[in-house]
């Protein structure tokens, strides 16, 4: 299990794509032996629900008979997109929290942080009947105050810079497969127009299944590994 903990010195690099910022945290990590007996992997998607992308992602999941976890932006859960949330949940996917407006969370007041979380939690519960169990901070921007305020498990993951249009589907596939190991969390995006990630997962999923991996939700990744999410911890793997 690899975990990132608040309190380490971090260097942050920021990329900008149009109006979309991404903040990548380079942090000290400590590695703990992975105790999972099976080769488990959790495929996770950020920045949905997106009509035109999330539905294609769900088609790929159905074709491959697997589940995933979706970290949703609350303000994107609308009358037009709510059916995607219900469809994902009905397929056995878990629906998690990715804030209301996708801000840098550490720059907010306590009240603003709680509104970002509660708004999205309520929108998800209205559709699925279940509250999120996990939170992924936008831009992986977090600190101890966020840990103290947000009573959810914190999730990061292994990505492939799939928010950058110049990173091809083939390169996204290669990067994810090179990082594969038991218990790892894949972090990709189902934002509007991200068709290259849709194409990438068409290759990633069968490749990992061919290596003996079982795709599970983020919740089952913990449960099947016999782990309980700890406070003050940001997980990249379990």
Residue ranges of model-derived segments:
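Acidic-and-aromatic substrate-binding clefts and catalytic sites of carbohydrate-active enzymes
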Residues: 48-52, 72-80, 103-108, 136-142, ...
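Short low-complexity, flexible loop/linker segments enriched in glycine and/or proline
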Residues: 73, 84-86, 111-113, 170-171, ...
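Catalytic grooves of carbohydrate-active enzymes
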Residues: 180-219
């Amino acid at each position: 299990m690899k975990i990132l903990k608040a309190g380490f010195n971090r260097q942050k690099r920021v990329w900008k794509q149009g109006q979309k910022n991404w903040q990548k945290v380079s942090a000290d990590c400590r590695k703990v032996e992975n105790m999972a007996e099976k080769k488990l992997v959790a495929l996770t998607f950020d920045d949905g629900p997106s009509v035109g992308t999330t539905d294609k992602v769900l088609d790929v999941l159905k074709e491959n008979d697997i589940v995933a976890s979706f970290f949703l932006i609350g303000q994107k859960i609308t009358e037009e997109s709510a059916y995607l949330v219900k469809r994902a949940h009905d397929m056995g996917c878990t629906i998690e929290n990715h804030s209301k407006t996708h801000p840098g969370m550490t720059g907010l007041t306590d009240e603003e942080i709680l509104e970002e979380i509660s708004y999205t939690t309520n929108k998800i519960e209205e559709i699925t009947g279940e509250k999120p169990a996990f939170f992924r901070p936008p831009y992986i921007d977090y600190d101890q105050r966020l840990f103290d305020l947000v009573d959810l498990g914190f999730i990061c993951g292994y990505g492939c810079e799939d928010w950058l249009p110049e990173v091809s589907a083939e390169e996204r596939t290669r990067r994810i497969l090179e990082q594969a190991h038991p218990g790892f969390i894949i972090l990709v995006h189902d934002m509007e127009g991200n068709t290259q990630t849709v194409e990438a997962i068409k290759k990633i999923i069968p490749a990992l299944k061919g290596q003996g991996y079982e795709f599970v939700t983020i919740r089952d990744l913990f449960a099947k590994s016999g782990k309980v999410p700890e406070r003050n911890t940001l997980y990249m793997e379990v």
